[in-house]
Amino acid sequence: MRAVVSLAVVFVLSYLLGSLVAGVLYSRGRGEDIRGRDLPGGSGTYRQYGKGAAAAVTLADILKGAAAVGLALWLAPQALPLATALATFGVVFGHCYPVWFGFRGGGGIAPFLGAMLVVAPWTLLATVTFALALIPLYRATLQPRLRLNAIPFATVVAVPVGLLIASRLGGGAEFLAGSAAMGIRAVHLLAEQRA
């Protein structure tokens, strides 16, 4: 029973932490709301406010992902990897659907990176390297035909490869949990664009 309570606390605290979306906080500090023009992650903040703001927002979002997993390691060490998977899902889902900001948040990439940085840094490094290597190849071959931004394409291809890498290097449960939360958000964003 105690483990169940610990897991519930980990999930709720991770979700609430994820709901503190740095891009929204930054833009509100300027008397605006970035979500009226863009997503509140690092890329949207870069487009709206420049490099310095984007770096600060991205770092804050990465740190909250790392903090959520650290919280899981501290509160529920007896329930690993379930605790860290719940923390990863919670912080990413909270970033995407923040309770503090009307359930309208970012895409979840930075908190996912932060969580994976703590749980499975080698899995993260290998997956990001693979995704970045795909981008120039995609732009040279498929992008003219598909007319889809390179980042979503690289993400779609890198997630299954990342799961394969995680099965060898570790962090599979957390990788799957974070990918699931980002996948829900991606489907939601695509549905909004088509409506």
UniProtKB/Swiss-Prot annotation:
Gene name, Swiss-Prot/TrEMBL: plsY2
User: Superkingdom, according to UniProt?
Assistant: Bacteria
Q: Where are the transmembrane segments?
A: 4-24, 52-72, 73-93, 115-135, 150-170, 171-191
Species per Swiss-Prot/TrEMBL record? Deinococcus radiodurans (strain ATCC 13939 / DSM 20539 / JCM 16871 / CCUG 27074 / LMG 4051 / NBRC 15346 / NCIMB 9279 / VKM B-1422 / R1)
| Stated name of the protein | Glycerol-3-phosphate acyltransferase 2
**What's its job?**
Catalyzes the transfer of an acyl group from acyl-phosphate (acyl-PO(4)) to glycerol-3-phosphate (G3P) to form lysophosphatidic acid (LPA). This enzyme utilizes acyl-phosphate as fatty acyl donor, but not acyl-CoA or acyl-ACP.
Compartment(s) of residence: Cell membrane
User: Which reaction is this enzyme known to catalyze?
Assistant: an acyl phosphate + sn-glycerol 3-phosphate = a 1-acyl-sn-glycero-3-phosphate + phosphate
Listed InterPro entries: G3P_acylTferase_PlsY
